[in-house]
Amino acid sequence: MQGSVTEFLKPRLVDIEQISSTHAKVILEPLERGFGHTLGNALRRILLSSMPGCAVTEVEIDGVLHEYSSKEGVQEDILEVLLNLKGLAVKVQNKDDVILILNKSGIGPVVAADITHDGNVEIVNPDHVICHLTDENASISMRIRVQRGRGYVPASSRTHTQEERPIGRLLVDACYSPVERIAYNVEAARVEQRTDLDKLVIELETNGALEPEEAIRRAATILAEQLDAFVDLRDVRQPEIKEEKPEFDPILLRPVDDLELTVRSANCLKAETIHYIGDLVQRTEVELLKTPNLGKKSLTEIKDVLASRGLSLGMRLENWPPASIAED
């Protein structure tokens, strides 16, 4: 039995044809007969459904209460603007959740390059058109929330946030995967006298946030890790090693005084026993507006200060508070 296993041919990477910076063709051969479809289909499914990335998930546009409306001076209706925002290709370093700011006025197109962001964010397609302003006096301002995720998550699946979602915050279908198109083809291959072998040709296009070769490499790694459990079934009864829970972002452990809010806002938060930034970001706008003496002006100040640090209200923090805070 062992001898038959060693007789399997080991495939090698024949060629990587770089069609463009976002489009490549990878050729792998020789494969035993049938293995071209086995590997090609597995990689294709992972590339389409399981690749991590960043996508727009929520948008707030000044003067817009819901997606079924229009804005004066903007050529597109709000639904079309949201659709255009879905095409935004973003790279985010060191963070899973960021807020981007867009302010534009005057006639002409509004493009991704008009978005304001910090050094942790890179807009891959800066020429991507978001909307068009049709009047010299027209303007548009929006807050764009970008999150890290995997695959495709429709806005309808996030209905659990509806009760906490304030009026004017628009949910967007999130397409996290940087892979735009994937196809594979199996052709005949030959090694010496053997002519019943496979050659696997994978053609892949991404949105630019991830290089095609890196996408295939990650998909292969995911597949290999999932198959590891089958390599040695004798280990199935060994106790699982619990992974250490990731630590919280240090900024969440800092007191709200570090935000340097006005005295009025700071006193209102302390009255509600909001002592740490981690306590604050878990509150929703609706909850804060119920705080005595805290009005919309103070709420706007809090939102802007959090946004400048890549945070927002309504965040969910598992296992909060940490033991170090709970003991205080």
UniProtKB/Swiss-Prot annotation:
EC top class, as a word: transferase
Region (Alpha N-terminal domain (alpha-NTD)), start-end ranges: 1-234
The UniProt record lists the keyword Oxidoreductase: no
InterPro entries: DNA-dir_RNA_pol_insert (IPR011262), DNA-dir_RNA_pol_RpoA/D/Rpb3 (IPR011263), DNA-dir_RpoA (IPR011773), RBP11-like (IPR036603), RNAP_asu_C (IPR011260), RNApol_insert_sf (IPR036643)
One MF term in the entry's GO annotations: DNA-directed RNA polymerase activity
Family: Belongs to the RNA polymerase alpha chain family.
Subunit structure: Homodimer. The RNAP catalytic core consists of 2 alpha, 1 beta, 1 beta' and 1 omega subunit. When a sigma factor is associated with the core the holoenzyme is formed, which can initiate transcription.
Family annotation (NCBIfam families): PRK05182.1-2, PRK05182.2-5, rpoA
Name of this protein: DNA-directed RNA polymerase subunit alpha
Organism: Haemophilus influenzae (strain PittEE)
The gene coding this protein: rpoA
